[in-house]
Amino acid sequence: MKVHFIGAGPGDPDLITVRGKKFIMQSPICLYAGSLVPESLISDAPADAEVFDTASMTLDEIIEIMADAYDRDLSVARVHSGDPSLYGAIGEQMRQLRKRGIPFDVTPGVPAYAAAAAALETELTLPGVSQTLILTRTAMQSSEMPSDETLANFGRTRATLAIHLSIRNIQKIRTELEPFYGAECPAAIVYQASWPNQKVLRCTLATLPKKVRAAKITRTALILIGPVLGARDFKDSALYNPQHVHILRPKKS
Protein backbone atom coordinates (compact mmCIF):
# COMPACT_ATOMS: atom_id res chain seq x y z
CA MET A 1 0.00 0.00 0.00
CA LYS A 2 1.16 3.51 -0.76
CA VAL A 3 -0.34 6.98 -1.10
CA HIS A 4 0.57 8.37 -4.52
CA PHE A 5 0.59 12.18 -4.69
CA ILE A 6 0.05 12.87 -8.38
CA GLY A 7 0.48 16.10 -10.29
CA ALA A 8 -2.36 16.02 -12.80
CA GLY A 9 -0.99 18.88 -14.86
CA PRO A 10 -2.83 22.10 -15.77
CA GLY A 11 -6.10 20.50 -16.87
CA ASP A 12 -5.85 18.89 -20.29
CA PRO A 13 -6.02 15.10 -19.71
CA ASP A 14 -3.31 14.62 -22.35
CA LEU A 15 -0.85 16.47 -20.13
CA ILE A 16 -0.84 14.08 -17.18
CA THR A 17 2.32 11.98 -17.01
CA VAL A 18 2.34 8.31 -17.95
CA ARG A 19 3.33 7.46 -14.39
CA GLY A 20 0.54 9.56 -12.91
CA LYS A 21 -2.07 7.94 -15.14
CA LYS A 22 -0.73 4.49 -14.25
CA PHE A 23 -1.14 5.12 -10.53
CA ILE A 24 -4.72 6.34 -11.05
CA MET A 25 -5.51 3.18 -13.03
CA GLN A 26 -4.04 0.97 -10.30
CA SER A 27 -5.39 2.61 -7.14
CA PRO A 28 -8.60 1.35 -5.49
CA ILE A 29 -9.06 4.73 -3.80
CA CYS A 30 -8.83 8.10 -5.56
CA LEU A 31 -8.94 11.53 -3.97
CA TYR A 32 -8.92 14.57 -6.25
CA ALA A 33 -9.30 18.31 -5.86
CA GLY A 34 -12.50 18.72 -7.84
CA SER A 35 -12.34 22.51 -7.86
CA LEU A 36 -9.17 22.39 -9.99
CA VAL A 37 -8.93 18.87 -11.45
CA PRO A 38 -11.41 17.91 -14.20
CA GLU A 39 -13.32 14.67 -13.63
CA SER A 40 -12.03 13.41 -16.97
CA LEU A 41 -8.56 13.14 -15.42
CA ILE A 42 -9.74 10.47 -13.00
CA SER A 43 -11.88 8.56 -15.49
CA ASP A 44 -9.16 5.90 -15.68
CA ALA A 45 -9.66 4.92 -12.05
CA PRO A 46 -10.89 1.32 -11.60
CA ALA A 47 -14.63 0.94 -12.13
CA ASP A 48 -15.09 -0.08 -8.49
CA ALA A 49 -12.72 2.55 -7.07
CA GLU A 50 -13.78 4.69 -4.15
CA VAL A 51 -13.56 8.25 -5.51
CA PHE A 52 -13.64 11.33 -3.28
CA ASP A 53 -13.78 14.99 -4.28
CA THR A 54 -11.73 16.73 -1.58
CA ALA A 55 -12.74 20.30 -2.50
CA SER A 56 -15.00 20.59 0.55
CA MET A 57 -12.95 18.41 2.93
CA THR A 58 -10.65 19.37 5.77
CA LEU A 59 -7.10 18.09 6.17
CA ASP A 60 -8.19 15.74 8.96
CA GLU A 61 -10.94 14.23 6.81
CA ILE A 62 -8.51 13.63 3.95
CA ILE A 63 -5.95 12.00 6.22
CA GLU A 64 -8.58 9.75 7.78
CA ILE A 65 -9.49 8.37 4.35
CA MET A 66 -5.81 7.68 3.70
CA ALA A 67 -5.37 6.07 7.12
CA ASP A 68 -8.41 3.86 6.56
CA ALA A 69 -6.97 2.82 3.19
CA TYR A 70 -3.69 1.96 4.92
CA ASP A 71 -5.55 -0.23 7.41
CA ARG A 72 -7.17 -2.04 4.47
CA ASP A 73 -3.88 -2.28 2.54
CA LEU A 74 -5.33 -0.27 -0.37
CA SER A 75 -3.25 2.20 -2.36
CA VAL A 76 -4.48 5.76 -2.80
CA ALA A 77 -4.17 8.08 -5.79
CA ARG A 78 -4.13 11.62 -4.38
CA VAL A 79 -4.55 13.81 -7.44
CA HIS A 80 -3.57 17.49 -7.35
CA SER A 81 -3.63 20.09 -10.10
CA GLY A 82 -0.46 21.23 -11.84
CA ASP A 83 2.69 20.14 -10.05
CA PRO A 84 1.97 19.22 -6.42
CA SER A 85 5.16 20.87 -5.14
CA LEU A 86 3.82 24.32 -6.04
CA TYR A 87 0.87 25.62 -3.98
CA GLY A 88 -0.37 22.04 -3.71
CA ALA A 89 -0.66 21.89 0.10
CA ILE A 90 0.94 18.45 0.07
CA GLY A 91 3.50 19.38 2.72
CA GLU A 92 0.97 19.15 5.54
CA GLN A 93 -0.44 15.91 4.14
CA MET A 94 3.00 14.30 3.92
CA ARG A 95 3.78 15.45 7.46
CA GLN A 96 0.66 13.68 8.77
CA LEU A 97 1.46 10.52 6.81
CA ARG A 98 5.00 10.45 8.20
CA LYS A 99 3.62 10.72 11.74
CA ARG A 100 1.40 7.72 11.08
CA GLY A 101 4.07 5.70 9.29
CA ILE A 102 2.06 5.59 6.06
CA PRO A 103 4.28 5.30 2.95
CA PHE A 104 3.87 7.70 0.05
CA ASP A 105 5.55 8.92 -3.11
CA VAL A 106 5.22 11.98 -5.33
CA THR A 107 4.75 12.11 -9.10
CA PRO A 108 5.48 15.53 -10.60
CA GLY A 109 3.14 17.19 -13.06
CA VAL A 110 3.20 19.84 -15.77
CA PRO A 111 2.93 23.17 -13.90
CA ALA A 112 0.47 25.90 -14.86
CA TYR A 113 3.20 28.38 -15.76
CA ALA A 114 4.58 25.95 -18.36
CA ALA A 115 1.13 25.49 -19.90
CA ALA A 116 0.67 29.26 -19.92
CA ALA A 117 4.00 29.78 -21.70
CA ALA A 118 2.96 27.17 -24.26
CA ALA A 119 -0.34 28.96 -24.83
CA LEU A 120 1.57 32.21 -25.31
CA GLU A 121 4.08 30.50 -27.61
CA THR A 122 6.90 32.13 -25.71
CA GLU A 123 10.10 31.28 -23.88
CA LEU A 124 10.28 32.65 -20.36
CA THR A 125 14.08 32.97 -20.32
CA LEU A 126 15.75 34.77 -23.22
CA PRO A 127 19.46 35.64 -23.63
CA GLY A 128 20.15 39.23 -22.64
CA VAL A 129 16.54 39.81 -21.58
CA SER A 130 15.86 37.64 -18.55
CA GLN A 131 17.43 34.46 -17.23
CA THR A 132 15.31 34.30 -14.08
CA LEU A 133 11.72 33.23 -13.55
CA ILE A 134 10.11 34.05 -10.20
CA LEU A 135 7.10 31.95 -9.20
CA THR A 136 5.08 33.76 -6.58
CA ARG A 137 1.67 34.86 -5.39
CA THR A 138 0.19 37.73 -3.39
CA ALA A 139 -1.33 37.66 0.06
CA MET A 140 -4.95 36.58 0.33
CA GLN A 141 -7.17 35.75 3.29
CA SER A 142 -6.12 32.10 3.14
CA SER A 143 -2.36 32.72 2.93
CA GLU A 144 -0.10 35.47 4.19
CA MET A 145 3.24 36.22 2.54
CA PRO A 146 6.59 36.21 4.37
CA SER A 147 7.61 39.81 5.09
CA ASP A 148 10.49 39.92 2.58
CA GLU A 149 8.55 38.29 -0.26
CA THR A 150 7.00 41.44 -1.65
CA LEU A 151 6.17 42.47 -5.20
CA ALA A 152 8.52 45.42 -4.78
CA ASN A 153 11.44 43.16 -3.88
CA PHE A 154 10.73 40.90 -6.83
CA GLY A 155 10.15 43.88 -9.10
CA ARG A 156 13.61 45.26 -8.42
CA THR A 157 15.06 42.23 -10.22
CA ARG A 158 13.06 42.90 -13.41
CA ALA A 159 12.96 39.14 -13.81
CA THR A 160 10.06 37.34 -15.46
CA LEU A 161 7.21 36.97 -12.95
CA ALA A 162 4.63 34.19 -12.90
CA ILE A 163 2.06 35.29 -10.34
CA HIS A 164 -0.32 32.58 -9.16
CA LEU A 165 -3.61 32.71 -7.26
CA SER A 166 -3.75 36.50 -7.35
CA ILE A 167 -6.19 37.62 -10.01
CA ARG A 168 -8.30 39.43 -7.40
CA ASN A 169 -5.26 41.55 -6.51
CA ILE A 170 -4.69 42.71 -10.07
CA GLN A 171 -4.78 46.45 -9.26
CA LYS A 172 -2.29 45.97 -6.42
CA ILE A 173 0.00 44.06 -8.79
CA ARG A 174 -0.04 46.87 -11.33
CA THR A 175 0.50 49.59 -8.72
CA GLU A 176 3.41 47.89 -6.97
CA LEU A 177 5.25 46.67 -10.07
CA GLU A 178 4.88 49.65 -12.40
CA PRO A 179 7.70 51.66 -10.74
CA PHE A 180 10.14 48.85 -11.61
CA TYR A 181 8.91 47.49 -14.94
CA GLY A 182 7.26 50.57 -16.38
CA ALA A 183 3.69 51.02 -17.56
CA GLU A 184 4.42 49.61 -21.02
CA CYS A 185 6.04 46.38 -19.82
CA PRO A 186 4.46 43.40 -21.62
CA ALA A 187 2.09 41.29 -19.55
CA ALA A 188 -0.34 38.43 -20.09
CA ILE A 189 -3.16 36.64 -18.35
CA VAL A 190 -3.83 32.99 -19.12
CA TYR A 191 -7.15 31.78 -17.77
CA GLN A 192 -7.52 28.02 -17.23
CA ALA A 193 -4.42 27.14 -19.21
CA SER A 194 -4.92 24.04 -21.41
CA TRP A 195 -8.64 23.71 -20.57
CA PRO A 196 -11.21 23.82 -23.42
CA ASN A 197 -12.31 27.30 -22.26
CA GLN A 198 -8.76 28.67 -22.02
CA LYS A 199 -8.40 32.42 -22.54
CA VAL A 200 -5.14 34.17 -23.44
CA LEU A 201 -4.97 37.92 -22.97
CA ARG A 202 -1.93 39.99 -23.92
CA CYS A 203 -1.57 43.50 -22.59
CA THR A 204 0.78 45.85 -20.78
CA LEU A 205 1.26 46.27 -17.07
CA ALA A 206 -0.80 49.48 -17.22
CA THR A 207 -3.76 47.78 -18.92
CA LEU A 208 -3.76 44.60 -16.81
CA PRO A 209 -6.68 45.55 -14.52
CA LYS A 210 -8.82 46.76 -17.42
CA LYS A 211 -8.22 43.56 -19.40
CA VAL A 212 -9.10 41.35 -16.44
CA ARG A 213 -12.29 43.26 -15.68
CA ALA A 214 -13.39 43.24 -19.32
CA ALA A 215 -12.89 39.48 -19.55
CA LYS A 216 -14.67 38.97 -16.21
CA ILE A 217 -11.89 36.72 -14.94
CA THR A 218 -12.08 36.15 -11.19
CA ARG A 219 -10.17 32.90 -10.56
CA THR A 220 -7.89 30.15 -11.97
CA ALA A 221 -5.74 32.54 -13.97
CA LEU A 222 -1.97 32.99 -14.12
CA ILE A 223 -0.43 36.42 -14.55
CA LEU A 224 2.87 36.74 -16.42
CA ILE A 225 4.89 39.94 -16.44
CA GLY A 226 8.26 40.78 -17.95
CA PRO A 227 10.15 42.04 -21.01
CA VAL A 228 10.47 38.49 -22.40
CA LEU A 229 6.78 38.57 -23.32
CA GLY A 230 7.42 41.23 -25.94
CA ALA A 231 11.05 40.64 -26.87
CA ARG A 232 11.71 40.05 -30.57
CA ASP A 233 15.27 41.25 -31.16
CA PHE A 234 17.00 39.08 -28.57
CA LYS A 235 20.32 37.48 -29.38
CA ASP A 236 20.60 33.77 -30.09
CA SER A 237 21.67 31.47 -27.30
CA ALA A 238 25.26 30.23 -27.36
CA LEU A 239 23.91 26.70 -27.06
CA TYR A 240 23.81 26.08 -30.82
CA ASN A 241 26.42 28.63 -31.87
CA PRO A 242 29.10 26.85 -33.96
CA GLN A 243 31.76 28.93 -32.18
CA HIS A 244 30.63 27.64 -28.79
CA VAL A 245 32.72 24.55 -28.07
CA HIS A 246 31.79 22.06 -25.35
CA ILE A 247 32.19 18.39 -24.48
CA LEU A 248 29.39 17.28 -26.82
CA ARG A 249 30.52 19.54 -29.66
CA PRO A 250 34.33 19.71 -29.54
CA LYS A 251 36.36 22.07 -31.65
CA LYS A 252 36.70 20.84 -35.21
CA SER A 253 40.23 20.18 -36.37
Regions found by a protein language model. Give the residues of each.
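Class I SAM-dependent methyltransferase SAM-binding "motif I" and its flanking Rossmann-like core
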Residues: M1, D12, D83-T157, L201-R202
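Class I S-adenosyl-L-methionine
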Residues: M1-V110, A115, P209, A221
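A contiguous loop/helix-start segment that scaffolds small-molecule binding in enzyme catalytic cores
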Residues: K2-V3, E61, D71-V76, T132, ...
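Short secondary-structure boundary/capping segments
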Residues: K21, S43, D68, L124-L126, ...
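Short beta-strand/turn micro-motifs composed of small residues
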Residues: Y32-G34, H80, R137, L165, ...
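Residues at the C-termini of beta-strands that transition into short coil/loop
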Residues: G34, A55, P108, G128, ...
